[in-house]
Amino acid sequence: MKNNHTSLKSPLDEEDELKTDHEIDLEKGPLPEYDSEEESTLPPYSDHALVNNPPNTHRENHSYRTTDNSSPLLIKLLISFTSIILFNAPAVCYLKYKDAFFKNYGAAEWTLFGFWCLVCTLALIFLTYFYETWTKAVKVTVISLAKCVKVTAIFLAQCVKACGKGIKHFLKKWENMPMAFSEVFLFNILVGSPRMNLRYIFGDRWGLKCSLADHIIFVVLSILVFIAETVKPGSIRVNLIRKMGYEAKQQVNEYTAVPLREMNPESEA
């Protein structure tokens, strides 16, 4: 069945449409060639293209706006003035302590005070003008000092930890040294106690020689003990309490050990 479609447009309307099709939009430029065979593409300046790609008017409107994150002038002046006050505070406190603040000022003192006020004013202007620069420098300096303090604290903590380990290792390795030196000291007392009798028997000359020999023996024995403990730790230790306790424990285990047959006579059956 054929669909007979008759156009209701007049010839004048068709001529107007042809004219509008051939006219060039001055704002959009000439229309590019449109390939009707490609179904995925749409003709330019179509309504669908305008919906998908709206004009970027929002970006253009905000392109000329610049964000100003700088501090207001009043805050800059306040911070700069506060820094100058803090810088001058020690001098004012010193003059107050000496009771010489605005007292007995002569021409030279007032001239110096005026010059100092001029320097402070110039410093205030300089700090206000270069506010971002010096505040950034102060922040970097504070952060660097904090890092230095942190590194120093970590280093000291590691040093203390290493010293603690060294002392612990030393005490563990040389725990027998006090016992050995106490034995040598006891030997020195036992041998050196009769020095007065030696002097009385052999005279001052031989008694002095015996006394010196006593001290030399003590030093030599101490050095030998130290060398022996260095070469082989525990070789000179005489820990009688531990040794006696260990032997007593062994004897108790030997005498109190009961065979399993006597403890469990039922096991034989």
Curated annotation (Swiss-Prot):
An example GO BP is:
meiotic drive
* Membrane association type: Multi-pass membrane protein
- Keyword tags: Membrane, Transmembrane, Transmembrane helix, Vacuole
Any one Gene Ontology cellular component term annotated for this protein: vacuolar membrane
InterPro entries assigned: WTF (IPR004982)
* Compartments, record wording: Spore membrane; Vacuole membrane
Annotated region Disordered: the residues are 1-67
Q: Where is the composition biased (Basic and acidic residues)?
A: 19-30
Major subcellular location class? membrane
Q: Mind telling me which Pfam families this protein's record contains?
A: WTF
**Transmembrane annotation, as ranges:** 73-93, 110-130, 140-160, 174-194, 216-236
Identify its protein family. Belongs to the WTF family.
Relate the assembly described in the record: Homomer. Interacts with other proteins that exhibit high sequence similarity.
Q: What does this protein do?
A: Acts as a suppressor component of the dual wtf meiotic drive system, and can suppress but not confer meiotic drive by compatible poisons. Wtf meiotic drive systems promote unequal transmission of alleles from the parental zygote to progeny spores by encoding a poison and an antidote from the same locus; the poison is trans-acting and forms toxic aggregates in all spores within an ascus, wherease the antidote is spore-specific and targets aggregates for degradation by the vacuole.
Task: Please identify the protein, giving its name as recorded.
Answer: Meiotic drive suppressor wtf5
What gene makes this protein? wtf5
